[in-house]
């Protein structure tokens, strides 16, 4: 869920039909678009290796590779401290512009953010001589109430655009940790995105059941719950976003 520059999911394109070919459940959007909903195709059980494809690897080992692939990040056993790719590796100009989290049982919107348009950002930077931080958009910090930890199913809806190149095999692997403990792995396929398209998507997150002791510790230790979101095109890492979480809101 690391998206302030958002994170998420699956959908139709405003540039024409088939902007994303991946949806399993479809629902008409206002305005005639199509919102596709995806559940994770693979969700590794908590506290265990995800795919049995090999021994655990370290962040340093992955940083030494020329190409990082999905099977590599699935073998990480802790959250990363650094980004595993550079912003310029996103040669497809994938840009997340809006992000919303909602409780699927009640429909309550829990979090929503939109990215300012580029022209506004450029004008503000020119007027105020603001230095550009290349990490902006790669990290987001969330604060939720304790009740969030008792939710079972959450929908994360995102809008994103792609540049003038087709995007094939677009996939996100998101791994959530509390301290050194892997809580859950989510693995979503976006599918194919046509060039110069704007897409709207929703990922369905089915959260693990946590013990009361773990819930208490997560509430008492804000921002020690962290996640990595890895984005792949044709099985090559092109984007890496991070997030951390507090669950003591309203206290």
Curated annotation (Swiss-Prot):
The keyword Protein transport applies. The modification N6-acetyllysine is found at residue 24. Tetradecanoate binds at residue 142. The modification N-acetylserine is found at residue 2. Residues 1-56 are annotated as: Disordered. GO terms for molecular function: lipid binding. Belongs to the PDE6D/unc-119 family. Adopts an immunoglobulin-like beta-sandwich fold forming a hydrophobic cavity that capture N-terminally myristoylated target peptides. Phe residues within the hydrophobic beta sandwich are required for myristate binding. This is Protein unc-119 homolog B. It comes from Mus musculus (Mouse). The lineage of its organism: Eukaryota, Metazoa, Chordata, Craniata, Vertebrata.
């Amino acid at each position: 869920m690391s998206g302030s520059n958002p994170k998420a999911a699956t959908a139709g394109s405003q540039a024409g039909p088939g902007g994303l070919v991946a949806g399993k459940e479809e629902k008409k959007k206002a305005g005639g678009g199509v919102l596709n909903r995806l559940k994770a195709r693979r969700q590794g059980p908590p506290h265990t290796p995800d795919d049995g494809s090999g021994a655990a690897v370290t962040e340093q080992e992955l940083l030494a590779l020329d190409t990082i692939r999905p099977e590599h990040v699935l073998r990480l056993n802790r959250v990363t401290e650094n980004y595993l790719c550079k912003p310029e590796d996103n040669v497809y100009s994938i840009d997340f512009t809006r992000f919303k989290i909602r409780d699927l049982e009640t429909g309550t919107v829990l979090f929503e953010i939109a990215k300012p348009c580029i022209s506004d950002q450029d004008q503000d930077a020119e007027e105020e001589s603001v230095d550009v931080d290349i990490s902006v958009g790669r990290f987001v910090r969330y604060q939720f109430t304790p009740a969030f930890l008792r939710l079972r199913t959450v929908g994360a809806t995102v809008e994103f655009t792609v540049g003038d190149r087709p995007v094939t095999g677009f996939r996100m692997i998101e791994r959530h940790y509390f301290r050194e403990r892997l809580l859950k792995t989510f693995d979503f396929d976006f599918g194919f995105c046509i060039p110069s398209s704007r897409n709207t998507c929703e990922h369905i997150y089915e959260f693990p059941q946590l013990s009361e002791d773990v819930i208490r510790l997560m509430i008492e230790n804000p921002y020690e719950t962290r996640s990595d979101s890895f984005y792949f095109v044709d099985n090559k890492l092109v984007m890496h976003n991070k997030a951390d979480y507090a669950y003591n809101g309203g206290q």
